A protein has these predicted regions:
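Face-selective signature of the C-terminal outer-membrane beta-barrel domain
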Residues: 1-124, 144, 212, 249-256, ...
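Hydrophobic, lipid-facing positions within transmembrane beta-strands of outer-membrane proteins
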Residues: 24-30, 91-97, 135-141, 183-185, ...
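Repeated loop/turn-to-beta-strand initiation elements of outer-membrane beta-barrel proteins
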Residues: 40-43, 106-109, 148-151, 205-210, ...
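Transmembrane beta-strands of outer-membrane beta-barrel pores
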Residues: 49-55, 115-121, 155-161, 170, ...
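Membrane-embedded beta-barrel scaffold of Gram-negative outer-membrane proteins
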Residues: 51-55, 144, 148-156, 160, ...
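C-terminal beta-signal and adjacent terminal beta-strands/loops
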Residues: 159, 321-326, 346-401
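Gram-negative outer-membrane beta-barrel transporters
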Residues: 209, 214-220, 236-324
Length: 401
């Protein structure tokens, strides 16, 4: 419920929202593995069956002097929300076969084929049934160039699972100016081909590992926001399939024990990644990044073990590359950025193996900010009506366990 202050000691209710959803899932999986050719090959085959059910209902009441109030909605006037009551059910069958082949001590190949057959039915204010089927192959080739260098190539078709909440109307928890987020009963699964090259180098004297990865993703039926407005006076966006896109990037990781400076129990981990993406915006017709897509991330951490004192402690620093990380909707564009995230821990183990751990999260004055640009008539019209800047400051939190 939402209330407006109408005076120093009075208030008036102007909104009632009641949202209830229940998700149930049942999964059965069985497989059998068979060795071939004296252990140089093996085959695993099996099947998985999954049932997922979402029951969802939403009631909306507003202050409307010309309407008929309902006690069930807190004394406010009911509003008809499309697709407010619905049951969505998926039955999915997935037979699979996985083949492992060790050519020699330096080369191996894992290949697999999964077939997904699913039926999604929706009952309630909207009744609809749709069937999907996908063949999902994968190849994973590994080659030990030397005893310390391994190369790996992967090609895989990845099909993303649908979120049932996108089919039905629900509360809009991200936008206080909009009460309801519409559902879309016409969603299809998004999927992509993933191509990866990996290289791993084991450092001398067993002090650690360094690795690098490059990837390319070729997307089909990407899910982002689309226009599902009932009328020009009631602009509404929902998740929907916007077309094809691509995503690519690179990543470098390292994990090193500082034995070279006489601290073999000090482990330092570092990583850096960069990525970009491209898709055609359904509202503006421009090429842009995927919504919420990262530009990159850097992490640095260390862990120091002191076995003689039964103590270990460490610190982790994480930072994302902000700037131009946007979310596009029908009537607004959001830009997100945040400060680096720092955590620390201290752990002690007693002689009777009781462990005490102290953690400190979000060291410093961590801040997350969101800028929202809201446009009159939609972002395609280009008439900026409102600029909102929302920042959250979170202090340091401590825990002892």
């Amino acid at each position: 419920e939402r209330w407006n202050l109408t005076g120093p000691y009075s208030e008036s209710k102007n909104l009632f929202l009641d949202s209830v959803s229940t998700t149930r899932e049942r999964i059965v999986r069985s497989s059998y593995t068979l060795d071939l050719f004296r252990g140089s090959q093996d085959i695993e085959f099996g099947a998985e069956r999954a049932q997922t059910i979402l029951d969802s209902s939403l009631a909306l009441g507003v202050l409307n002097p010309s309407g008929i109030a309902s006690a069930a909605l807190g004394g406010l006037v009911p509003v008809n929300v499309p697709n407010a009551r619905s049951t969505v059910e998926e039955m999915r069958y997935e037979p699979f076969i996985i083949h492992n082949w060790v050519f020699n001590s330096r080369m191996s190949l894992e290949s697999s084929v999964l077939y997904e057959d699913s039926k999604i039915s929706q009952r309630g204010q909207i009744s609809k049934e749709r069937n999907y089927d996908y063949v999902k192959p994968k190849l994973d080739f590994r080659y030990d160039l030397t005893p310390t260098i391994q190369l790996r190539g992967t090609m895989e078709k990845i099909v993303q699972q649908l979120s049932f909440n996108d089919f039905v109307a629900a509360l809009d928890t991200r936008d206080e100016d909009r009460d309801v987020q519409f559902g879309n009963e016409n969603l299809k699964q998004e999927w992509y081909w993933n191509y990866e090259l990996n290289a791993e180098y084991r450092l001398p004297n067993d002090i650690g590992v360094a690795s690098a990865r490059v990837f390319y993703e070729d997307w089909t039926d990407r899910i982002e926001r689309i226009d599902v407005s009932p009328s020009k006076d009631n602009l509404q966006g929902a998740n929907g399939n916007v077309g094809d896109g691509e995503k690519y990037g690179a990543e470098i990781n390292s994990s090193t024990r500082m034995r070279m400076i006489g601290l073999p129990n000090l482990l330092i981990n570092a990583s850096i990644s960069v990525e970009d993406s491209r898709i055609t915006d359904p509202f503006l017709g421009i090429d842009r990044r995927f919504s919420f897509s990262w530009r990159g991330r850097q992490t640095l951490s260390f862990r120091h073990d002191l076995p003689s004192k039964r103590i270990n402690w460490g610190i982790r620093y994480s930072n994302s590359q902000d700037g131009n990380r946007k979310f596009y909707d029908l009537i607004d564009i959001e830009v997100w950025d945040s400060d680096p995230f720092v955590t620390a821990f201290f752990e002690w183990r007693s002689v009777d193996n009781t462990t005490v751990r102290f953690e400190a999260n979000q060291l410093g004055n961590w801040e997350f900010c969101r800028k929202r640009f809201r446009y009159s008539g939609g972002i395609a019209e280009g008439y900026l009506a409102e600029l909102e800047r929302n920042c959250n400051h979170r202090g340091t939190t401590f825990s002892l366990r």
